[in-house]
Amino acid sequence: MALETKPAQDPATEIKHELDPKRKAALDTALAQVEKSFGKGSAMRLGDQPVQNVEVIPTGSLALDMALGIGGLPKGRIVEIYGPESSGKTTLALHVVANAQKKGGVAAYIDAEHALDPAYARKLGVDTDSLIVSQPDNGEQALEIADMLIRSGALDVIVIDSVAALVPKAEIEGEMGDSHVGLQARLMSQALRKMTGALAQAGTTAIFINQLREKIGVFFGNPETTTGGKALKFYASVRLDIRRIQTLKNGDEAVGNRTRVKVVKNKMAPPFKSAEFDMLYGEGISREGSVIDMAQQVGVVKKSGSWFTYEGDQLGQGREKVRQFLKDNPAITEEIENKVKAEFGLIGSADQFAEDEDAAAAAAVSEAAAADAAKDTKATAAPAAKSSRAKA
């Protein structure tokens, strides 16, 4: 006798159980008291608010945006970028700043290392005239300034460069050789406890750049660790491990690095994905190079021999020539980029965009027609009113 098996029910379509009326009344009373004491929205049912997608800031690399799973770095969260020296940590952070500014956002840069190069930042697209920069004297001052700027609610992104340079005041005022065990870790733990809630309320992304150190006496496993204690590892929603894997050369001249970023931690999407992209000297992340790589991966751009084709048209021979072609034709670059994002499900398809545009155009036409009709009604009503007053 065969056993009957019922198909598994989708959790989203499960029947909602009705709450006992007495318990429901008690819960509603408690929620009303919470709102009265702490303000509207302090506690609510998750279903009371419409589900909203997480706002993101693009990183400048399409490959990294796809690896993050949501199209960029999440707003209102803490992000840690760490890696060896000269691996591109600051460059990546500056690209995020530039992209936030391009969207009309406000950015701040806490330069604890006192090493920010405004000329290089401008080459990466940063609007240095509107960038808020602070070069604090000690770690407490740096984190206090960061906290005050975040609580203003006006920032979109703030970069702290770097955690290793957040030296506690006691260490600066003390003598060389004095022991200050755990002082920086306690400072970071206290600051992150204060910042986390403020970042979420303000919708500000905080990027902490960190350095690597080696643990002494570790014979098995990875001896590398980051500075500033363990608090940042817990509070960060995204942790990025950035490494230089290859030197890019034009003949004998080095023109940049091939960079790999591993998403070590990700609370927004599945972690442990990697992205590779070109980082060119004096130019930063090659957006066009990343678009070529990802478009080729999903089949939007095809490669035959050394020739690259897009929708049957040849883009050029050799990756460097295609990169230059896309740089000279930003409209084509954006079109290819949108198709790649659609393949990954981050945005609607091109057909959906066309439908949305048609709907928006139709709505605009109907609004204009309604406005014209209202004007005509007013125009005909005015003489009638005048004549009625004259008769009276």
Curated annotation (Swiss-Prot):
Q: Which SUPFAM superfamilies match?
A: P-loop containing nucleoside triphosphate hydrolases (SSF52540), RecA protein, C-terminal domain (SSF54752)
Ranges of biased composition (kind: Low complexity): 379-392
Q: Which domain of life is it from?
A: Bacteria
- Positions of the UniProt region annotated as Disordered: 1-21, 372-392
| Gene3D superfamilies, per database record | P-loop containing nucleotide triphosphate hydrolases
Q: Which InterPro entries match?
A: AAA+_ATPase (IPR003593), DNA_recomb/repair_RecA (IPR013765), DNA_recomb/repair_RecA_CS (IPR020584), P-loop_NTPase (IPR027417), RecA-like_C (IPR049261), RecA-like_N (IPR049428), RecA_ATP-bd (IPR020588), RecA_C_sf (IPR023400)
GO cellular component term of the entry, any: cytosol
Any GO BP annotation = SOS response
The entry marks the following residues as binding ATP, namely G83, P84, E85, S86, S87, G88, K89, T90
Its chief place of residence is cytoplasm
Question: SMART domains of this UniProt entry?
Answer: AAA
PROSITE patterns (UniProt xref): RECA_1, RECA_2, RECA_3
Which keywords describe this protein according to UniProt? ATP-binding, Cytoplasm, DNA damage, DNA recombination, DNA repair, DNA-binding, Nucleotide-binding, SOS response
Which family does the similarity line name? Belongs to the RecA family.
Q: What does this protein do?
A: Can catalyze the hydrolysis of ATP in the presence of single-stranded DNA, the ATP-dependent uptake of single-stranded DNA by duplex DNA, and the ATP-dependent hybridization of homologous single-stranded DNAs. It interacts with LexA causing its activation and leading to its autocatalytic cleavage.
Q: What is this protein called?
A: Protein RecA
Organism of origin: Bifidobacterium breve
